[in-house]
Amino acid sequence: MNKSGLSLGRGLYAVTPDEPDTARLLAKTSRVLAARPCLLQYRNKFASAALRREQAERLLALCRAAGVPLIVNDDLALALDLGADGVHFGRDDGSAAAARYALDASGPGRILGVSCYGEWPRAVAGAAAGADYVAFGAIFASPTKPSAARAPLGLLGRARRELKVTVAAIGGITLANAGDVFAAGADLAAVISDVFDAVDPCARAEAYRMLSRE
């Protein structure tokens, strides 16, 4: 149980790619959602505001039908306006405490996640500000962010022991190394490429779910 009062579970945290083709994004995401990941994050760093809104709105409808919470990356105003299930904040996205207040004011059960990179003090501050999960990364070399600094696996276990929040790992995670991430202490493996670029995204997402149970 986290600040939002929700159990975020253990397994896959699917994160959408920077996909300009909305039809293709929806088709792939539908297949991922069929495997019931713990969360889906809408992330598109290169889309216009209008396209982000259109894609997020349509993804929210898919998530509602699948019973999977939708988290909006970086954009609290969009998350609140659409009634999404939560927002994910990076270091440049504003105050986590202010986001927590706004989410709580919008209704019960809203989820706040914060990127902590490889920075333990940021995780402590995020948890104190009301984050439901803290995300560390890049755990491995990432095709999405090839220049990202690496975060040690040991942070996952420390967060699991010392913070009363869900622990997520991101960055270069594949089926080949996800077992190490869960064993180190992560509750959630946040994955973009290895799921959305798979020949069968549903089967790949299901494989993560099964792996998290081992």
Give the location of each predicted region.
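Conserved N-terminal beta1-alpha1 strand-loop-helix module at the mouth
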Residues: 1-96, 101-132, 148-151, 158-167, ...
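Short, glycine/charged-rich beta-strand-loop motifs at protein surfaces that mediate ligand recognition
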Residues: 143-147
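C-terminal binding/interaction regions
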Residues: 188-191
